[in-house]
Amino acid sequence: MKTLLEVSNLTSDDIESIFNLTIQYFNNTNLNHNILTGKVIVNLFFESSTRTLSSFEIAEKSLGAHSITLNINTSSINKGESIIDTISNIDAMNPDLIIIRSQYSQFIKKISEYLPSCSIINAGDGHHEHPTQALTDYCTIRYIKKDINNLNISICGDILHSRVARSNIRLLSRYGANISLVAPPTLSCNLTGISHIYHNLIEGIRNADVIMLLRLQKERIINCVIPSEQEYSHLYMLNHEKLLHAKKDVIVMHPGPTNKGIEISNNVAEKNSVILLQVKMGVAARKAILHYLLYNKSI
C-alpha cells in the first residue's frame, strides 16, 4: 500500500499492522529513528492545521526522513498557479510521499487519479474523510478498551460537516461498534454504519462506552443552522452532570481543536477526557502509517 486516501483503502491486515506499529511507537518514542533515512516527504496543507501537521512533521523527522512543509502563503499559488499545477510540480521533483490537506471534499482523490504514480496521504479533505485521525482514534479506543466489538460509541456535535465523524463511522463500524450520532437536526445526517440518531445529548450518551465530541465547524457553515452558540452549548455541551448518564468507565475523546464552553466544559476537558492521550497517539499512529507505507517491514 503506497497511498491512503480513505478508510476503505485499508484491509483488515493493514489496520492490524498499523495498530501494532502504533502501540510500539506509543510505548517507545525513540524507536526506529533512522528507518526512513533518505526518504523525502512533502507536506502540502491548503487548510489550517495544528495537530495533524505537527504530528506528521514530528513523525517524519523522528524516523529520519527529509521533511518539507510548503508554505502555501509564499508559494506560486499567490502568483496564479493552480493547486493541481503546484502538486504536479512537486511530484515532478520525485518525493517519496506527498501529504495533502484540502478544504474541498474528494479533491485529493482527484489529484491521485490525475497523478497515479504519486504516493499520497489524505490529511483531511473537506467534510469527506480524515483517515489518519480515524486510525488514531481506533488505536486510542483499542488501547484503552482492548476491543471495539459491541462498544457503544456516541459521536456528538457537528456531524454534517465532519470528516472525522465519517472516517470514524466507516472504520469503527467494521469492527462491530454500536455507533450513535447526537446532534441538532440541522447538523445531523444519516450515514451508513450508525445505529441511532439522537437530538438530545443525555439520551444519546446514555450507557456510552466512548463519547467522541466534535466542534461546530463555523468555517463550513454557510447558513445559520443553530439559533446561537449559547443555546447550542446549553443543549449539547458535555459537562460533568450530563456525563453521569454515560458508563462510569466512559472515555471522552475530541479530535481537536476544542472550543471549551461550547461542546465541552473546561472541567470535563481537563479531568475526564483522553484528549492529550489522543494527541500522543496521533504522533505514534502517523509514525506507524509512514513506516507501513514507505518501509512496510516489521520492526
Curated annotation (Swiss-Prot):
UniProt keyword annotation of Transferase present: yes
TM spans (from-to): none
GO biological process terms on file: 'de novo' pyrimidine nucleobase biosynthetic process; 'de novo' UMP biosynthetic process; amino acid metabolic process
SUPFAM superfamilies membership: Aspartate/ornithine carbamoyltransferase
Recorded superkingdom: Bacteria
UniProt keywords, alphabetically: Pyrimidine biosynthesis, Transferase
Pathway: Pyrimidine metabolism; UMP biosynthesis via de novo pathway; (S)-dihydroorotate from bicarbonate: step 2/3
Reactions it catalyzes: carbamoyl phosphate + L-aspartate = N-carbamoyl-L-aspartate + phosphate + H(+)
EC number: 2.1.3.2
Positions of carbamoyl phosphate binding: R51, T52, R101, H130, Q133, G256, P257
GO CC aspect terms: cytosol
Molecular function, one GO term: aspartate carbamoyltransferase activity
The keyword Transmembrane is assigned to this record: no
Binding site for L-aspartate: K79, R163, R215
Family: Belongs to the aspartate/ornithine carbamoyltransferase superfamily. ATCase family.
Function: Catalyzes the condensation of carbamoyl phosphate and aspartate to form carbamoyl aspartate and inorganic phosphate, the committed step in the de novo pyrimidine nucleotide biosynthesis pathway.
Record note on quaternary structure: Heterododecamer (2C3:3R2) of six catalytic PyrB chains organized as two trimers (C3), and six regulatory PyrI chains organized as three dimers (R2).
Protein name: Aspartate carbamoyltransferase catalytic subunit
Organism: Ehrlichia chaffeensis (strain ATCC CRL-10679 / Arkansas)
Gene name per UniProt: pyrB
